[in-house]
Amino acid sequence: MVGEAIPANGAKPHITVRDLTMAFGSFVLMRDLNFTVNHGDVFIIMGGSGSGKSTLLRHMIGLIEPAKGDIFYGDENFTKAEPAKRQELLRRMGVLFQTGGLWSSMTLAENIGMLLEEYTGLSPTEIREVASLKLALVGLKGFEDYYPSQISGGMQKRAGLARAMALDPEVLFFDEPSAGLDPISSRLLDELILELRDSLGATVVVVTHELASIFTIGNNSVFLDPETKTMTASGHPKELLAHCSDPTVRAFLRRETVSESLQDSG
């Protein structure tokens, strides 16, 4: 299961990562990454601490340039795209970072509205209506005029998700969405991610180390191994749990030590 994930059931590739190397100067973090995210996937980027999960996400949205390799969205080479084409591709993406990405000095509606004001020709009334709709989609109807400090951490994450959806993205990226949430709020956020994937027809990419989320929402994944500095497995998380022979992957998915995983496989 090492190498590029194969599209299942005729699914079309949405994102293709090809021969990607991530490095900071002479220090190589990950090399030779090859995988495909298919349309409609909830794709999990997983791995141990220091494996570069969040760094990979930042490469995929253009915040960091690769030392080598390319990232494609459909047939478009995002890595080598001209600035105008890259901006066009970026408008098709929504991102929820760990903190939620909300401006504390703005209301929830204003947080969403600033993107609509910058990238659309909507009137102030229309912007308010769209902001209200996005908040309603994440269960925050009636919270338009609340400030982030006035709502809970779980609600802030949902408001951040509403902001990420402001421009109707084709791809949603989540960086450790469950960070700082209690188990109930985390489960509710997982359910919301699946609901939005289904209702919006979006592709979802999630960085997480939470096994509950990995097995609940993920249908495709890649495992980054900091020891070998490359990907050591890809595919459906439940299939990897059942059949992957790599001891590090097995240990991660079973919450075992590597030595325990080797004993189990022996």
What are these regions (language model features)?
Residues 69-78:
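Conserved ABC transporter NBD signature motif
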Residues 166-170:
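A short, proline-enriched helix->beta-strand linker immediately N-terminal to the Walker B motif
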Residues 147-151, 155:
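Conserved ABC ATPase signature
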Residues 61:
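Helix-to-loop junction immediately C-terminal to a conserved catalytic motif
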Residues 124-143:
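Conserved ABC ATPase "signature" region
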Residues 172-175:
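Catalytic Walker B motif of ABC-type/P-loop ATPase nucleotide-binding domains
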